[in-house]
């Protein structure tokens, strides 16, 4: 992808569109009226907790300032689950395409024409990063950008959030998982079931995973952008996820292999989210170019 120009990869990501401005304003105005929602989103909580552990003190301070505007929990890790908790609320239907990217089989390089007019996870990440970086924007809009950015960086690292339109990212592909009697969605396996073992103690597990990110991994993971991360996910979707589910059964050995992939992607997402947030909120921190 190195020979792609930024204009080919994400035309218009360098500025905040009128549509996104309206979306952030609507989110900022509408959030206070939302009802309370239950728990969920172990993976998103873990990614944002890992990011929190890796952020600079200045960036943490900015996140805390924004999260204090939130009604209810002020924890960043909870804010990162908000985009899923409002699914089903018609006021936020416009967010639906921002969670994923559909690609034709065999795609090896991202260009902006692959992102539809209504948006995709790659464009969402890049434009939300710009919005969060702009200290002139109203605090409530920056809060919404922060929560959505935390969520979508997680989504782009889940392999099946960059998949095929024909089966809706594995949602329509049913498999038998472990000893469960009824077939379930392949997407559900990767969104939730592979993370079940972490759900009860996700905070300490997240901190352990954060401590395990070494110098070499930090160097390797501190490069690229949302388009690169999406193509990593798509490579995993084509080379591993669908191969494991080819016979309609995910057995014990395949579960172990899939959990290893999930662990790596959660760690990568957490580190990269910290990298992006440090650059957006701490002028002294290195990170993606504006």
Predicted regions and their residues:
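N-terminal signal peptide c-region/cleavage motif recognized by signal peptidases
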Residues: 33-35
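N-terminal, motif-rich segments that launch catalysis or mediate targeting to/interaction with membranes
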Residues: 37-152, 159-290
């Amino acid at each position: 992808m190195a020979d792609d120009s930024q204009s080919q990869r994400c035309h218009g990501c360098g500025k905040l569109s009128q549509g996104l401005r309206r979306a952030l304003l609507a989110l900022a105005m509408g959030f206070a009226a939302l009802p309370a929602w239950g728990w969920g989103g172990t993976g998103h909580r873990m990614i944002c907790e890992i990011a929190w552990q890796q952020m600079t003190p200045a960036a943490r301070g900015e996140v805390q300032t924004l999260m204090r505007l939130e009604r209810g929990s002020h924890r960043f890790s909870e804010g990162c689950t908000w985009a899923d908790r409002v699914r089903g609320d018609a006021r936020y239907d416009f967010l639906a395409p921002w969670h994923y990217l559909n690609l034709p089989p065999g795609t090896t390089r991202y260009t902006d024409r692959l992102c539809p007019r209504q948006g995709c996870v790659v464009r969402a990440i890049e434009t939300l990063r710009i919005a969060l970086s702009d200290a002139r924007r109203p605090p409530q809009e920056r809060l919404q950008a922060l929560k959505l950015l935390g969520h979508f960086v997680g989504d782009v690292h889940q392999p099946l959030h960059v998949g095929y339109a024909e089966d809706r990212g594995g949602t329509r592909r049913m498999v038998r998982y472990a000893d469960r009697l009824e077939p379930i969605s392949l997407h559900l396996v990767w969104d939730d079931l592979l993370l079940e073992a972490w759900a009860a103690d996700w905070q300490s597990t997240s901190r352990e995973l954060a401590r395990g990110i070494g110098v070499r991994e930090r160097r390797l993971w501190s490069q690229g952008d949302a388009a690169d991360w999406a193509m990593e996910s798509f490579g995993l979707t084509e080379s591993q996820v669908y191969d494991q589910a080819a016979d309609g059964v995910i057995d014990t050995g395949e579960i172990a292999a899939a959990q290893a992939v999930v662990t790596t992607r959660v760690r990568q997402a957490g580190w990269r989210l910290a990298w992006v947030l440090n650059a957006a909120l701490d002028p002294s921190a290195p990170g993606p170019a504006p």
